Amino acid sequence: MLNPIVRKFQYGQHTVTLETGMMARQATAAVMVSMDDTAVFVTVVGQKKTKPGQDFFPLTVNYQERTYAAGKIPGGFFRREGRPSEGETLIARLIDRPVRPLFPEGFINEVQVIATVVSVNPQVNPDIVAMIGASAALSLSGLPFNGPIGSARVGYINDQYVLNPTQDELKESKLDLVVAGTEAAVLMVESEAELLSEDQMLGAVVFGHEQQQIVIENIKDLVKEAGKPRWDWQPEAVNEALNARVAALAEARLSDAYRITDKQERYAQIDVIKSETIATLVAEDESLDANELSEILHAIEKNAVRSRVLAGEPRIDGREKDMIRGLDVRTGVLPRTHGSALFTRGETQALVTATLGTARDAQNIDELMGDRTDSFLFHYNFPPYSVGETGMVGSPKRREIGHGRLAKRGVLAVMPEADKFPYTVRVVSEITESNGSSSMASVCGASLALMDAGVPIKAAVAGIAMGLVKEGDNFVVLSDILGDEDHLGDMDFKVAGSREGISALQMDIKIEGITKEIMQVALNQAKGARLHILGVMEQAINAPRGDISQFAPRIHTIKISPDKIKDVIGKGGSVIRALTEETGTTIEIEDDGTVKIAATDGEKAKFAIRRIEEITAEIEVGRIYNGKVTRIVDFGAFVAIGGGKEGLVHISQIADKRVEKVTDYLQMGQEVPVKVLEVDRQGRVRLSIKEATEQTQPAAAPEAPAAEQGE
């Protein structure tokens, strides 16, 4: 019999329901979590046995959105969901980052978490629901998971923090921050902001962590009622004698190797030391496992770096704790791109370009929460050569998607509004060298490239990555961390912003016990580093260029009456297609009558504007137009007078004498002056060549009526 166990609780303005025991009973654990009609089904499966030769923790987190959740059928030929979207990939990373550090070191059994969105309320984002579900399922599973964790979204509206704001509230919010943590400590922060202060950002983190305690309490209560027995897993006993033997052979040599400042040279020396140590020990005892020896050597490396930092000694590359690596900033490095920059910080380098396009180039995104259009695109590429390796080159991986989104968040707050700068902007960051914080180098490079492209960004932005080494109550915050310091440290803390405030904050913490005080020190130290980098960047370019690149399309905007849109588009788009071909421009029309003409040539744009004005101009009775004969009939001729408008010249209005045959006076395609006599209620236009000719020949004007009377 199905026997569901349910917990309900109020979480801010939402009601959260946790339900287990009803579905997926063959999985290690399964939970259905709902928050006001947004429901996510999360399963966990853990393998009891490890794979032979396994030396890492194979945790996989999959997040998948089903279109039926929003009452939709998927697009595409197959009409079913395909590979994960960028949004799904980012949420999978959001779930993974806070749960991964809560598994004990040495646990290498395969674990898979699958979160499936099965119902969605357009006002409630499924990401927080999925994170709560993953925490609950892992806690119920009996796996050696040191959770549960809670998660919360924090907004900032009217100078007040808002817990789990709705999608509509987020549009008014100056902050979109997601925080996750255990009962005692914050583990992860992901955010974008409209240039808020360090204190405001820290306040949001603390607020979110305090509010999510109710989630942790309810998951604990659910585990008491429905949790599976804890796995009887113990880490392998430490071989103290072997550890001492490895340390005797390698500790001093590894410590010296970490004084080599050049990354490639240092890595080469470390590889030699490790290989020689393992070879020596295996020669002494063939039963020793090379993987086990590698793990011991890694622990010695980690301890060597950390102990030196805590002792106040210089870092791996000789810097003090708050020093920034040498900077080299260049703009306009690529001649035919719309904007470009090369940003180098030590051994990290990014070649960043900015490209301007029209609204037609914007990305249309079909999401579960609703369709939207994105006119600011940010793509981050991390080729293997950037770290001196070979590897596969192809579609972006999870890490590249995540880093690209973080860099985009760093720049988004300073981008101009669409009505002031109606371009689609694409920024691409090519990481050409990497030794720590390439995503923050991308933020700096993007700011420079956008200014070089003439994009009127509100301020320059820069990013910096901070690190932490902590033992007991002793801690040191490091500015501008290297790759090794990231890998061997306890925290990766990335901050982007302008001189005014923070635009993006990302934090991943590998240990418990990160206090508000430590975060405050890190934020203040990051501010000093950010201002230093901005100072160097401003020496290269301190304001957007006065004009966009000569190779970029120039967008000219005019306004027409919405009633005239159909005239410019024409039947089946015939008029606008002809206009595009005739003028060599790109023309886009919005529902409110805004017309955007994009052209790399100013004369072509002026021509297109003139043609549109002709098409949309109201026909004035009594005005003389230059027309072209389009059709000849027995009773007269039809003449086009521009703007797709046509009128009839009756046979009696062709000349000031009797006309027997229209073709005696007019030919197809002939250009003639015509005067508008009348526009009737149905929009039909009566024209006269006779009266137009009389008005354009003043000398003959008095005689023509007299001659006509004489006849």
UniProtKB/Swiss-Prot annotation:
GO terms for cellular component: cytosol. It catalyses: RNA(n+1) + phosphate = RNA(n) + a ribonucleoside 5'-diphosphate. This is Polyribonucleotide nucleotidyltransferase. The keyword NADP does not apply. Residues 694-711 have a biased composition (Low complexity). One of its GO terms (molecular function) is 3'-5'-RNA exonuclease activity. Its EC number is 2.7.7.8. HAMAP family: PNPase (MF_01595). The gene is pnp. GO terms for biological process: mRNA catabolic process; RNA processing. Keywords: Cytoplasm, Magnesium, Metal-binding, Nucleotidyltransferase, RNA-binding, Transferase. CDD domains: KH-I_PNPase, RNase_PH_PNPase_1, RNase_PH_PNPase_2, S1_PNPase.
